[in-house]
């Protein structure tokens, strides 16, 4: 019999289960933090990257301005030192009563300037030199910048230069009427004054010209050098080294996504799939000419609408394609930009592909223009093409595309073409006993999302721990939560839906209570549908009365697409109907059941318009054919998402499994044996349906244990279970009228469905195992975050907190606040706390360690002493009277007992509060309902959403010990280790 591992993988959790010979041996949960900023969804590395970029940008600007100051000092015989600032003081050249540089830039066009004023004009323009390359800005910022540049360009038409425009439009008006102050420069998050760099360069050239005419003497070389230095731009790196290798030819690089050949390949794929679907559902056969007609339309215009497609294929306008949405069947926006920029040309396909490759990889405009000059292009074409923004690649190379597309032009599908060419994805032949790191595999270039990478890393950690403990297995079943692979905004939308769903359920619970209905999942769902359907039956249109809701036999929840045919148990596939309507519908879609009755069907169409779009489409679907049923069912049983297939293939290709037996059940509706599949990606819809059918309550997302329940269900979701489940649902749908006539009780119904449980007493066995789980969390040892807060403050701002100047000096000495470049800042994160114990009194003391300490490589040695607001006590030096116990990091596991508790409890360390010398800790599973009497003393302010204890004073703890928890939740006492310093 099979040894099976199962995993429920989320973006911050891993639920797992191990079964052997159908016996549930073990299960558990691993919780970890998402690799992103929880408030914004931005990368954790983004603040460091932005700070580093800002430092580099400022350093380059400083170097550029210093170079200009040297040039100006030499040419104008000025003192270079006068233009340098020391200790953040104003440079000597700028002291005194000076004219505004905006006014000087205007005067420079009309009168001779002094050497000092001309120097100020040059440096002012060079310091704020406008926008040049905004191709790589994010879309939101770029749009705002381009809009402002265009608006200012229109206004500049009335002025000689940018300086004159800014002076007259803003500075002079303010000078004349000081009540209406308007900033000349942009302030934070404002783009109103954005100017193209080319206009500022033209202004400086014009000023040089005018000053020469007015009699200012300077060399031509000086002018050229100033313009060169002032507007110098470092060449941007290309990204060719980051491009992954072809899936078929590993020595070839992947083809750019926005190349003509790639567009043709994508268009062919979509068109062939559409034509094949029409063949399978309508029995219509299309020729190669039809394929080419559609393709030529796409390649000519870059778009193909659904309306055009229907016309070209001879279909009626009201025909609806599978998954038809919006106006366009195919829309290649980048391809349209490409053909527009090219205009008329005589270039061949290879040249066009290479041009697209250059645009994708070369980000520096000057370098790109040089590269484009190699082709038969005029200057206008080069300029237009260099403005395009291309990124991303396919998984295959030009070499592979050139082999595959000719066969696809004959009408062959992508997989058929690959089979005919004997093209096989490069696979790993060296299988291992343990799964290697993701970045050591062929798939390393497939994922760059840090959230997904962390989830994969933790999955590997848990998997390898299980293999080490239990040995090799026959099969691994995986389910990926739907948020895995989604970006932050998409996940926020999912979370919003879940919260709304939770609220709707709670509201329905209250309504059940008011109506005297049993509070169970069935009645809650009935009430939700009752409200959504405006109190009407979805099929008959009859008004549903409160008395109908109170009568268990009057109403039923119907699957719009029959469950046995679709395996769709989602809310969007459910409606509330009178039992009689459900008896008539049986194992059919609404159209199959009621479509022949035109009057009734018209009524159903009207009723459906008041429902959500997804539900409306299901009800009105007239073409739910057998082939679609199989596709729909397969999608609902197996996870076909890209990220799920990636994790599946990563596991399958690199892990060595036990051989599978030949007598295992075959897959439903398939000739291939399921026994030959070592790794399967299960759908969340299947898990949800089995969870409900096997009697597990709805997920409580506030505690972590539901991940393990899902993993157990995934472990037992084998082919025989799925077949038995499908047969049961089919019988339930087909015999609905008969079952109702016999008045089969709810208890009989529950007993009837037990026959396909994995083993007798399955539910209770699982719940018993779940109760044994200790949730695992990785200790977060790595220092991360800013060294200090961004805001620099005056010393006086801290006087109240620390009791005047002396208190501030003491706070600086103790490291509570820091001095950076003469200014005071608040500390960054406290990433570690070192715990000491007094040798005589046995009291505990804590030495906080901040990211700044780590950066300075200075290990603090003073423990926090509690102080009142407005004063600061000396911290306590950890000398020979104290002994080091252990270091705590976020999510360290500790055993603690306060003086009021009867026994110690395991908790996870969350944070240390230095002002109160206390801990913040949390319960491992965050489950409120199972708090013991002893735990309630510790977690006195816990609630359903958060089981956290704050203000746990450390000095008088009866028990305070550190433990280690493995990836599988095994707890062992931490061995004593010497206090760890910082490597220099």
Question: How would you name each of these model-derived features?
Answer:
Residues 472-517, 638-793:
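Long, compositionally biased intrinsically disordered regions
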Residues 2, 49-54, 436-449, 514-526, ...:
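Glycine- and acidic
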Residues 71, 358, 407, 455-469, ...:
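Generic, well-ordered alpha-helical scaffold segments in large soluble proteins
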Residues 2, 12, 530-534, 553, ...:
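Short metal-coordination and nucleic-acid-contact micro-motifs, chiefly zinc-binding Cys/His arrays
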Residues 16, 541-577, 585-593:
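Histidine-centered nuclease catalytic patch
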Residues 1-463, 706-720, 735-984:
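Extended, Lys/Arg-rich, non-catalytic nucleic-acid recognition/anchoring regions
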Residues 474-544, 567-569, 610-611, 617-619, ...:
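Short, charged surface segments at domain edges that flank catalytic/cofactor-binding sites
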Residues 76-77, 89, 118, 571-711, ...:
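Domain-exit/linker segments immediately C-terminal to small folded modules
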């Amino acid at each position: 019999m099979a040894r099976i591992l199962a995993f429920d993988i989320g973006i911050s959790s891993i639920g797992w289960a191990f079964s052997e010979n159908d016996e549930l041996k073990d299960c558990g949960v691993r919780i970890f933090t998402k690799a992103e900023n929880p408030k914004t969804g931005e990368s954790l590395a983004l603040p460091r990257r932005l700070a580093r970029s800002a430092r580099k940008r400022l350093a380059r600007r400083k170097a550029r301005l210093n170079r200009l100051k040297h040039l100006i000092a030499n040419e104008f015989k000025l003192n270079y030192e006068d233009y340098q600032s020391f200790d953040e003081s104003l440079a000597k050249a700028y002291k005194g009563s000076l004219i505004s540089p905006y006014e000087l830039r205007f005067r420079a066009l009309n009168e001779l300037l002094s050497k000092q004023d001309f120097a100020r004009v040059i440096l002012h323009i060079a310091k704020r030199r406008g926008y040049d390359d905004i191709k790589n800005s994010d879309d939101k910022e770029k749009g705002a910048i381009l809009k402002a540049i265009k608006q200012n360009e229109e206004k500049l038409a009335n002025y000689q230069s940018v300086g004159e425009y800014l002076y007259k439009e803003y500075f002079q008006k303010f000078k004349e009427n000081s009540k209406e102050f308007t900033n000349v420069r942009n302030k934070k998050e404002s783009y109103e004054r954005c100017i193209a760099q080319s206009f500022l360069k033209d202004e400086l050239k014009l000023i040089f010209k005018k000053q020469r005419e007015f009699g200012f003497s300077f060399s031509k070389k000086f002018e050229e050098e100033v313009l060169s230095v002032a507007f110098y731009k470092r060449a941007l790196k290309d990204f060719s080294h980051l491009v992954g290798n072809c899936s078929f030819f590993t020595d070839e690089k992947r083809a750019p996504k926005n190349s003509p050949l790639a567009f043709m390949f994508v268009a062919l794929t979509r068109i062939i799939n559409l034509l094949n679907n029409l063949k399978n559902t309508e029995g219509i056969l299309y020729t190669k000419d039809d394929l080419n007609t559609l393709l030529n339309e796409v390649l000519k215009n870059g778009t193909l609408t659904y309306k055009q497609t229907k016309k070209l294929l001879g279909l009626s306008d009201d025909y609806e394609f599978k998954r038809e949405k919006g106006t366009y069947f195919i829309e290649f926006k980048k391809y349209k930009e490409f053909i527009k920029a090219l205009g008329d040309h005589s270039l061949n396909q290879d040249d066009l592909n290479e041009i697209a490759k250059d645009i994708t990889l070369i980000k520096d405009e000057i370098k790109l223009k040089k590269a484009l000059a190699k082709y038969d292009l005029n200057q206008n074409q080069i300029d237009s093409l260099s403005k395009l923004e291309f990124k991303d690649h396919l998984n295959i190379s030009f070499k592979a595309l050139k082999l595959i597309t000719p066969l696809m032009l004959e009408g062959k599908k992508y997989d058929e073409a690959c089979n005919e060419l004997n093209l096989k994805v490069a696979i790993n032949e060296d299988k291992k006993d343990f799964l290697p790191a993701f970045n050591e595999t062929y798939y390393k270039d497939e994922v760059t999302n840090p959230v997904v990478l962390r989830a994969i890393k933790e999955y590997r950690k848990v998997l390898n721990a299980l293999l080490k403990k239990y040995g090799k297995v026959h099969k691994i079943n995986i389910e990926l939560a739907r948020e895995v692979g989604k970006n932050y905004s998409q996940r926020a939308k999912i979370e919003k839906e879940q919260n709304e769903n939770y609220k709707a359920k709670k509201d329905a619970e209250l309504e059940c209570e008011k109506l005297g209905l049993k509070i169970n999942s069935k009645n809650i769902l009935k009430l939700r549908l009752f409200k959504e359907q405006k109190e009407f039956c979805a099929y008959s249109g009859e008004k549903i009365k409160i008395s109908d809701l109170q009568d268990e036999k009057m109403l039923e929840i119907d699957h719009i697409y029959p469950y046995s045919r679709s395996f769709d148990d989602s809310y969007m596939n459910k409606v509330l109907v009178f039992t009689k309507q459900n008896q008539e519908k049986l194992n059919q879609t609404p159209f199959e059941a009621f479509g022949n009755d035109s009057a009734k069907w018209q009524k159903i169409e009207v009723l459906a318009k008041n429902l959500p779009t997804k539900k409306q489409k299901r009800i009105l679907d007239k073409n739910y054919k057998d082939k679609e049923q199989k596709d729909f069912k397969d999608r609902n049983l197996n996870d076909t998402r890209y990220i799920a297939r990636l994790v599946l293939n990563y596991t399958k290709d690199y892990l060595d499994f036990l051989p599978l037996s030949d007598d295992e059940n075959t897959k439903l509706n398939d000739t291939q044996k399921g026994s030959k599949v070592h790794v399967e990606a299960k759908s969340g819809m299947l898990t949800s349906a089995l969870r409900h059918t096997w009697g597990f309550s709805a997920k409580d997302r506030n505690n972590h244990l539901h991940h393990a329940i899902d993993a157990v269900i995934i472990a037992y979701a084998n082919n025989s279970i799925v077949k038995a489940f499908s047969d049961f649902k089919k019988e339930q749908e087909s015999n609905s009228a008969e079952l109702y006539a016999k008045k089969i009780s709810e208890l009989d119904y529950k007993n009837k469905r037990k026959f396909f449980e994995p083993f007798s007493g399955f539910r209770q066995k699982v719940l018993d195992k779940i109760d044994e789980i200790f949730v695992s969390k990785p200790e977060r040892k790595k220092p991360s975050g800013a060294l200090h807060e961004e805001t620099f403050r005056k010393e006086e701002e801290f006087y109240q907190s620390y009791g005047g100047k002396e208190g501030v000096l003491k706070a600086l000495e103790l490291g509570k606040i820091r001095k950076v470049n003469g200014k005071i800042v608040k500390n960054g994160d406290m990433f570690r706390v070192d715990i000491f114990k007094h040798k005589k009194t046995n009291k505990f003391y804590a030495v906080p360690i901040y990211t700044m300490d780590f950066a300075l490589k200075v290990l603090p040695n003073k423990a926090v002493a509690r102080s009142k607001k407005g004063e600061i006590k000396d911290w306590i030096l950890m000398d020979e009277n104290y002994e080091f116990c252990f270091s705590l990091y976020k999510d360290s596991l500790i055993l603690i007992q306060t003086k009021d508790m009867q026994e110690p409890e395991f908790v996870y360390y969350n944070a240390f509060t230095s002002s109160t010398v206390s801990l913040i800790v949390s319960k491992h599973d965050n489950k409120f309902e199972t708090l013991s009497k002893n735990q309630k003393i510790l977690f006195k302010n816990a609630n359903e959403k958060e089981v956290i204890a704050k203000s746990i004073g450390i000095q008088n703890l009866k028990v305070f010990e550190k433990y280690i928890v493995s990836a599988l939740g095994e707890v062992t006492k931490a061995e004593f280790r010497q206090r760890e310093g910082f490597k220099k």
